[in-house]
């Protein structure tokens, strides 16, 4: 079953081209709008000009849970807080809470991604899901796919 034919049936070369374009835009955004990522990239001697395809992902630094905690609460945001429409946070049981902010575009992307996943494993609009979860942010993200999933 196919959710988004234009993406899911795209030839490999076209898909990699889209991935490369979006990857480069993301790197440019975080480099220019997030001091944390700019510093991490500069420490590695990497600039957005060094990122030309999805294959260049190996040039970029990792982001760890400690990075998220050390920049608590919003030090890694690449957009103004006025664009954040939803915030998810861990309980902080093992340290500072891990906070992630989402824009409307982020939530739409999650919905699209999860709708594709539900469709790929055969779910249809007449199926019933039970998703039992804690309130960790990855679990809450699944709600967006479930809420927007209407038909296969």
Cite the ranges covered by each PLM segment.
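Nucleotide 5′-phosphate-binding alpha/beta core
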Residues: 1-89, 94-112, 116-120, 124-126
């Amino acid at each position: 079953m196919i959710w988004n034919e234009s993406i899911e049936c795209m030839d490999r070369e076209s898909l990699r081209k889209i991935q490369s374009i979006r990857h480069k835009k993301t790197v440019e955004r975080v480099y220019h709008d997030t001091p944390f990522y700019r510093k991490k990239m500069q420490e590695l001697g990497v600039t957005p000009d060094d990122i030309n395809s999805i294959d260049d992902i190996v040039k970029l630094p990792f982001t760890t849970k400690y990075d998220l905690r050390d920049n608590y609460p919003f030090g890694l945001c690449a957009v103004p807080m006025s664009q954040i429409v939803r915030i998810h946070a861990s309980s902080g049981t093992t340290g500072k809470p891990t906070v992630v902010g989402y824009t409307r575009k982020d939530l739409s992307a999650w919905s699209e991604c999860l709708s594709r996943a539900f469709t790929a494993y055969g779910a249809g609009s007449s199926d019933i899901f039970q998703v039992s979860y804690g309130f960790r942010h990855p679990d809450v993200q699944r709600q967006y796919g479930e809420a927007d999933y209407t038909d296969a």
